[in-house]
């Protein structure tokens, strides 16, 4: 009689499922706990702000008048359009300045990469209060030293309350670190040397190559840089208030004393718009990645 070996006897048997280790369960529980705490940390203040804006103090019910009254609020249209114009101009100037710089450094002048990175990081090292004090001192030269000269007229033109170009120039400097990092990440992820060489071999000029080849390859990076710049400009308060210009953030602070619920409603709405822009950029990025993989 033939006896089966242990290996042969268990060949057709199904192995029992491996037990879940307690360490993995604990790690999963800790993850959920941390995410729950972070969610409460962000959602509780937002929920309290929303409740503060929709609560009717007089009758004790709920109302949406503070949200519906935003477009007709005194000074809202002027401050919002001014900040939006400043944001658009800042984005255009920053991209016109940094896109050719990043492409040139990565394609032709790689030795200058460290120098350019250090220069673009300077606004993060320099406090905004120190920057605005320096700008204010320079602007004071116009009436003190250059009165009745073309330079003084140029200084005065930069400080027009309707569209303060001096804020655009300062915001471009503040946005350089974010714009450079976003564009540099996109350039490193794209095969720009091959793309530009192919375009040049087909007879395209450098401006045509930059517009038709480089910018489409860096579309997501350009969107990220633009969004970061818009968020910076729409939320900047210190420089605008010290230089004496009314922008969207300074308007919110100004009305917070007389209309606190309206100011909080505007802040909540701005936060929601920011989230929507983030979701749109993420959706475009995922859509582009899906097209590239397919």
Residue spans for each PLM region:
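Transmembrane alpha-helical segments of polytopic membrane transport and secretion proteins
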Residues: 1-35, 109-113, 281-294
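Interhelical loop and adjacent transmembrane-helix boundary motif
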Residues: 21-28, 67-76, 234, 240-292
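Short membrane-interfacial helix/loop motifs at transmembrane-helix boundaries
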Residues: 29, 37-74, 294
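Transmembrane alpha-helices
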Residues: 33-42, 122, 166, 173-184, ...
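Membrane-interfacial helix termini and adjacent extracytoplasmic/periplasmic loops
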Residues: 64, 132-172, 240, 244
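Transmembrane-helix boundary motif in ABC transporter permease subunits
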Residues: 89-121, 133, 186, 214, ...
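Short helix-to-coil transition segments within interhelical loops
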Residues: 108, 188-193, 197-218
